[in-house]
Amino acid sequence: MKNRNNRSSTNFPQQTHFIGVLLPEDITLTLEDCRRYMKDAYGCKSGHATPIHVTLVPPFRLPEEYSTADLARAIENEVLPKGLGFTGHIDNFDAFGDRTLFAKVISNEKWVALRDAVTSAVLKAAPGCTKKDARPYQPHISCSNRDIPAGVMTDALQVMNELKRVIIKSCG
């Protein structure tokens, strides 16, 4: 969970919170290197202020009558007892058009169940603050978004996928 009340953004001024899954340190460090590459090579900074994560509930505005503690309590009471924990896996890099470059998390029913349970708990704690996305859920870990220069996505994806091959070779 991240509270972004102190940050202002011209694109999303009313969004104060999102809920995501943090990743193990080794994966986080590798993906921070990917973010650094995108910043150094293309000047990308959008999305780099948040920790590396898989989003479960996208950014939303939490009304003042509710608190982050209300959300945490709801997740603790409604989601944790369901024992929805599992091990996720990353398979390569991909993109949503020319807008978002991401590490592709292998989607399965466990990710969907976790996302649905967390969204339900948030809506129970703070009705109307967000809504379940109607699109199919694609868990992913954004490396860069919104400020990727036009025409560079193919080259950036090639570099990211080569990096993945180097990581696999060094672990094998």
Where does each model-flagged region fall?
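Short, low-order "capping/linker" segments at domain edges
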Residues: 99-109
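Extracellular/luminal beta-rich ligand-recognition
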Residues: 96
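Basic, often amphipathic N-terminal segments
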Residues: 1-87, 108-169
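Short edge beta-strands and adjacent beta->alpha junctions
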Residues: 91-92
